[in-house]
Amino acid sequence: MSSDSFDPSRTPPAEPEGIVRQRIRVTLRMLGSLLLGGMAIMGSVLVFRQGLLPLIDTVFQPGPAWLSVCRRAGIILVAIAGYWAYVHWHEKRKATELQLQPVALILGGVGGAALVALPIAMLFAFGAYELVLFRGASPALLGVAALIGIAATLEELVHRCLLFRLLERAWGTVVALAVQAVLFALPHLENVAHGGPGDIVAMLMSVTVLGLLWGGLFVLTRNLWVVAANHAAWNFTILLTGVPLSGIEDWRAVAPLESRYAGPDWLTGGIFGPESSLLAIVSTTVVVVLLLRAARRRGAFFKAAA
């Protein structure tokens, strides 16, 4: 056999070495940007809570109620300011994803409430959930609603505006959607730590689908407030019905309705609540498919960085 004859063992790799190095560089650059952006957001919140908030309390002495309002409003404002500063100084662009779009925001909120209200209504109709008592609204409900809104906005700021965008720029839309959805689900393991394997599997499935839902909505709208409104409305609607919200039992005491679940876990969602119900998972998956198809038709999908 001549030296220049074909030898399978000498077949070059599927990807040239230069492309591999380029992908490694892109990934490292993405990780560096992610670290910097995370530090900008979390650092701003830390400075506010440890420095500015105690100063406000000392100088103005607003009292516990108003100090709580300042804390909640301040956390959102400084987190967004930190993100804006990161985008402005590091990415050197306008943070268009922070622009308010009132009509789209309202539609996002209504859509989030309707999307989870439908399977919950079906669960009540099937007898899987039972209404025990109508308590009416309590003053504490407003405070919990504010916490839900803050948590939803912060989660979307970190997971969609920062994490997803940077993943998308490095690896493309499809891979970024999948990775951020899984990373969104993993922190929720703590909420079902006292449950069984079935609760854990159902939670991972349901929250991964939710990560795809809000990731897909961000791909379609490229707007923080639309996605945050959808997320917050989803959570608040669950709270109103008196069933567990993402495995959190504490807030059920302030819900206008007192409810209990009486069906099998695959139908009720078990300890995690209706988000892990098969009905909610299926209906949300259908909406995810529709969102991603609409986003693709708009040309909102991007390939990995070269």
Protein language model annotation of sequence segments:
Residues M1-A95, I238-A306:
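N-terminal, membrane-interfacial amphipathic/helix-forming hydrophobic leader that caps
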Residues D4-P13, R25, L46-V69, H88-V158, ...:
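Juxtamembrane helix-loop-helix connectors linking adjacent transmembrane helices
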Residues A104, V175, W225-V226, S276:
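Residue-level recognition of membrane-helix boundary sites in multi-pass small-molecule transporters
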Residues G109, A113-A114, A145, G149, ...:
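Residue-level signature of the transmembrane alpha-helical core
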Residues L133-A145, A193-S206, P274, L278:
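Juxtamembrane helix-entry segments on the extracytoplasmic side of multipass membrane proteins
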Residues V201-W266:
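Functionally important transmembrane alpha-helices
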